Amino acid sequence: AAHAGGAFGFGAQRGGKGGNMSIFSDGHAAMQAFNPQAGWVFAAIFGVLLLASAIAAALKWRLHGQANATIDNLNARINAWWVMTAVLLLAFWLGRIGTIVLFFLVSFAALREFLSLVESRRADHRVMVVCFYVLLPLQYWFVLTDWYGMFSIFIPVYGFLLLPIIASLGGDTDHFLARTAKIQWAVMISIFCLSHVPALMNLKIAGFEGQNILLLVFLVAVVQASDVLQYVWGKLLGKRKIMPALSPSKTVAGTVGGIASATLLAAALYPITPFSPFQAALIGLIICIMGFLGGLVMSAIKRDRGVKDWGNLIHGHGGMLDRVDSVCFAAPVFFHVVRYFWNG
């Protein structure tokens, strides 16, 4: 891997070349081959899942068929992780286009969940149609064609202006600002933030050509591991709640232990990245903190709407947004840190 140097261990490469609107730009953009190193990471994940499944099965066996909500929920969570990991592996194996399609579908599901919880009126229906059938496909088209200029400003600028314009044409001014702002939030979180995950495939990093899929593996593995480890440490040692009004299940010990453990995991994964061990740990710490804060923000929104979960799409986990809320906040930061310091 090509390691960057400079202040705080980061390189001086910044900016990057704009996209040329070609799906096959620079030869790497069409379908990057699945990297063997990513395969080893997934093998380790499947190994952990196999161990977790064995432990859960043993716990259930000890109950001799008696119902236990905690054990049943644990089994449901583990089974869901098997499915999610397999789907992610398949998308990564298919390469760049498969990964973009997967996250397009994730954004679609997340947007649907978000908009289903906001108050809407008849005048908002056209706005929502634009969100699903204009903003969503165009944003991922810009990822597919590697058009960074439009990818970075389309939703924050043009989408931000377009949505209230369409809403105002409906002639309904009742709670206009609140209705429009909620839809803008839904688009930013569900489409713009999530689209930064597959956009990592478009970065051009010296000495790392054709291996960008490993950046996605690093991001998803570290952020999701942080979530799981915060839960585990919280169950083992957690007593003091960190933000009981927002997330009653989060504890100080769980948060600190989970983020610290995931940061160590990030350092251990440095061989699959263009980072040094220190850089990988520092970036891991940043994205874990962003993931934690993102989880708090999304929990605050759920509390405001009076619901426990965003949906029930993923058995044992809730909705799509319940599973990717931390990634939504970590992905843009990770993307721009890598692009600023490593992109050629």
Feature map (PLM): residue ranges:
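Membrane-embedded alpha-helical bundles of polytopic integral membrane proteins
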Residues: 22-286
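Interfacial loop-to-transmembrane junctions
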Residues: 305-326
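Hydrophobic alpha-helical transmembrane segments of membrane transport and translocation systems
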Residues: 328, 332-337
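Short, strongly hydrophobic alpha-helical membrane anchors
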Residues: 3-36, 344
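Juxtamembrane boundary at the C-terminal end of a transmembrane helix
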Residues: 337-344
